[in-house]
Amino acid sequence: MKAIAGPLGVNRRSLLSAPALLSVPALLRVTSALAQEQNSQIPSWNDGPAKQAIIDFVRATTDRASAKFVPPEERIATFDQDGTLWVEHPMYTQVLYCLERVPAVVAQKPELKEREPFKTVLSGNREAMAKLSLHDLEEILVATLTGMPVEVFEGEAKKWIETAKHPRWKRLYTELIYQPMLEVLQYLRANGYRTYIVTGGGQDFVRVYSQQVYGIPPEQVVGTATGTKYGYDKGGKPFLTKEPKLLLNDNDAGKPEGIHLEIGRRPRAAFGNSTGDRQMLEYTGAGDGTRLMMLVLHDDAQREYAYGPARGLPDTKVGAFTQKLYDQAMKDRWTVISMKNDWKRLFAFE
């Protein structure tokens, strides 16, 4: 029988053959070392099935003696961003950026001043803005995110993200990253996994800060993407202009499509929080071998927000986690992360 090595390099054969390890104090030391190792990996997690699922997955897929071993080149993990890696309520961060960009856009195009939905945004009436339709928001996004050189967009987005603060915490949006998920990113990378963001948000927008905030380089961000047009400036220097042409809608089925297009491998692990992530988790779970699929359930109104409507939580238009999705997670053996019960703390500043 082949000896199976444990996480500390101690296999069954050496355990049974080493007299020193048969003593109670020695066994207690081994048990204590295992517990300390587990707690040190993702310390912002409470002990429980969710934490254990992550640790068991990493141990099994990185242990060469395990039948579940995954070669390093196949170790890919994908993460949704909004509601999975950082706060998405009361509104998606990029949508807020676009709304705040409207005055600058109207200053360049005065003809938009009396046109809807720009007129409503300029009024500052939050109640009226909350009633804007999806078509209205799409029109605002096109006006504020396209028609400019890529470098200009990046500069404007960077300037905004470095100063914009959340209305509840009065902190930068980039400070409202879930510490438990940051630890998972780091834990996976420490064990040879490449981590990717696969988001319904704008690909170029997230790439502005992904390296600094998540340790994920821009080339490992897959998001909703618009076209670009090649051209030359007055001095003959080549540049790209962002065009109002949708290339990839990275929501729902667009997520596995984007993964295939831009990554080229099926993930071994996938993390999300809403119906828009369902197909990414399905696609991940349909592969051979060991897989890890996890969904964050926002059930902590005291520390963050509570919304579903799964399990009787309040309904929402932002990051909906439906009962149907919850039931599928149970059926397909995905792990549901309870923000309230599984996370010791939410943010690094706590």
Where in the sequence are the language-model features?
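Asp-based phosphoryl-transfer active-site loop
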Residues: 75-89, 281
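N-terminal secretory signal peptides
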Residues: 1-11, 23-28
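Short, solvent-exposed loop/turn elements at domain surfaces
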Residues: 63-65, 86-88, 230-231
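C-terminal cap/substrate-recognition subdomain and adjoining C-terminal extension
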Residues: 3, 19, 36-41, 45, ...
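Mature N-terminal segment immediately following signal peptide/propeptide cleavage
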Residues: 40-81
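ATP-binding/phosphotransfer module of carbohydrate and carboxylate kinases, centering on a glycine-rich
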Residues: 15-16
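A metal-dependent, Asp-based hydrolase signature
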Residues: 91-175, 179
